[in-house]
């Protein structure tokens, strides 16, 4: 499972989600990027503590890899089972890249805009079923995508079939233009 967000976005409450996912799914890996050594060491230490409290070894589940060039990054996204969006600070650029690679995203929608970026993308491409509201929903959905290949493949195909709307719909731009023009009057 790919965790490609900027490391500071992974709040401590996300640690427990990973532990619960590890327990539910069993043998699995959460792949993070070491873009900043200090942030990586802080996150790794936190995850080690969280997994240890659950009588699990973080090293059996958590992997930090070097930052990749764009071709390798897209290659990894195309091979991953699922993209775990950061909570409570959602990803946008990485979520768009995941959509480019037809990688299913699971997000937990936040209260504020910063926690609704990926959910906005998913809703726009008619995949609201990938947007969760609770930890239990998040865990169940991730487990289903990882354990049910047919379901995961169906979601991938839905992404492929609907992702062009994110690039070809000019209505949001026209709405913003209208708003800005009205503000100048």
Regions found by a protein language model. Give the residues of each.
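Short acidic active-site motifs
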Residues: 71-73, 93-94
